[in-house]
Design a protein with these regions (language model features):
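Conserved class I S-adenosyl-L-methionine
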Residues: 203-213
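Class I SAM-dependent methyltransferase SAM/SAH-binding core
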Residues: 214-257
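A short acidic, Gly/Pro-enriched loop at the edge of an enzyme's catalytic core
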Residues: 256-268
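A short SAM/SAH-binding and catalytic strip from SAM-dependent methyltransferases
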Residues: 267-281
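N-terminal auxiliary segments of SAM/dcSAM-dependent transferases
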Residues: 2-47, 52-61, 65-161
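A short glycine-rich, Lys/Arg-flanked "PGG" loop and its adjoining helix->strand segment in the class I
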Residues: 283-296
Length: 344
């Protein structure tokens, strides 16, 4: 294949069935795009002039397919890298029920962005393509830099209503299969959280998760930091019923109605201000209520299975100081959104 021949454009004028049609296409894309880094030659630099003199490539999609797979990485050598997620290794291993997960690795990079637009539901991305050798080299540089911002510019919208997808108003129902999928999908988050907090060498006592789901994430945190006290809220009665065994202080409530006092929390995890969980408007409304709960010099850590809806720049407008923007998992050789902010 020639450089830039790898990414398939979607042409469908109507929505595709998720498993029977979309996933089938995504398997084709994966087979065309994926490479094992051990099979790719090492290079010791990239030639920017060469790349920017290449013929640009155009990739197209619609916002009712998988637009949330398109991501931007910035800054890298003063430029913006565009990429697109391909089928997740967790899906291939049957550990999640979604086609994609939160992790990004080298084969998902496309090249340097030239321009992008969204018009009449159609997304058009024009970029200067990387070779596989360049993808490997660039990714190996990016994965060492915790300040690189991963931004997902496009949201999935329902074909008929044009609205963003959200979870049910009463929250998720609980079932053992969902619990397993949620657990597998956040293994890398748990590992990175433990590593990051241990490196800070600070004793965070009151830990709050306003949408704690099964409570197992907080339970895992407490195992690693046994002196902490965990508070877990969730919209779903079923989830809180399960979480009772895993959280020090569980409560069924909507995060926007959180009863916690301002300046009462040392560390808050936000794992639900994400695409397909809440819509963008509500993500901001909820965040405005929640961030004052954290004490000065406390931390807010934000990530999720799907893209974070609040932009890094907007977090900063609320007076939060960014410490890192992404996490890295060595086992999967993957990066993912992992925002850590200090409260002024």
């Amino acid at each position: 294949k020639n450089v830039g021949d790898f990414m398939y454009s979607y042409k469908n004028k109507k929505p595709l069935d998720y498993y029977n049609e979309l996933e089938k296409k995504e398997i084709e894309i994966y087979n065309d795009t994926y490479f094992n880094e051990n099979d790719i030659a090492n290079i010791n630099k990239i030639d920017l002039n060469n790349i920017f003199n290449r013929k640009t490539v155009i990739f197209e999609d619609y916002d009712y397919n998988l637009p949330q797979n398109i991501f931007l990485l910035k800054p890298y050598k003063g430029k913006i890298i565009v990429g697109r997620k391909i089928r997740s290794i967790l899906r291939i291993e049957n550990k999640i029920n979604a086609i994609n997960c939160s992790m990004i690795n080298a084969p998902m990079l496309l090249g340097f962005l030239k321009k992008r637009n969204l018009k009449d539901r159609k997304i058009k991305i024009e970029y200067y393509p990387f070779t596989n050798e360049e993808k490997k080299f660039v990714f190996d540089e990016i994965k060492k830099n915790r300040k690189i911002d991963i931004y997902y510019p496009y949201k999935y919208r329902d074909f008929y209503t044009g609205k963003e997808e959200t979870s049910p108003e009463t929250g998720w129902t609980f079932n053992p299969e969902k619990k397993e999928y949620l657990g597998y999908g956040e293994v890398h988050f748990r590992k990175f959280t433990e590593k990051f907090i241990k490196e800070l060498n600070t004793d965070y006592k009151i830990i709050y998760d306003p949408a704690c789901s099964t409570g197992e994430f907080l339970n895992d945190y407490k195992k690693n930091f046994p002196m902490s006290y965990t508070i877990g809220h969730d919209l779903s009665k079923e989830m809180i019923e399960y979480a009772k065994n895993y959280v020090d202080e569980p409560l069924c409530c909507n995060a926007i109605n959180s009863p916690l006092k301002n300046n009462s929390v040392d560390l808050m995890f936000l794992r639900f201000l994400n695409s397909e969980v809440v819509d963008t408007k509500n993500a901001y409304k909820i965040f405005k209520v929640l961030y004052p709960k954290v004490k000065k010099k406390g931390l807010i850590i934000c990530f999720g299975h799907t893209p974070v809806l609040i932009r890094k720049e907007m977090f900063q407008r609320y007076g939060l100081i960014p410490i890192i923007c992404n996490g890295y998992d060595k086992e999967r050789d993957a990066i993912f959104q992992f925002y850590v902010f200090e409260v002024k």
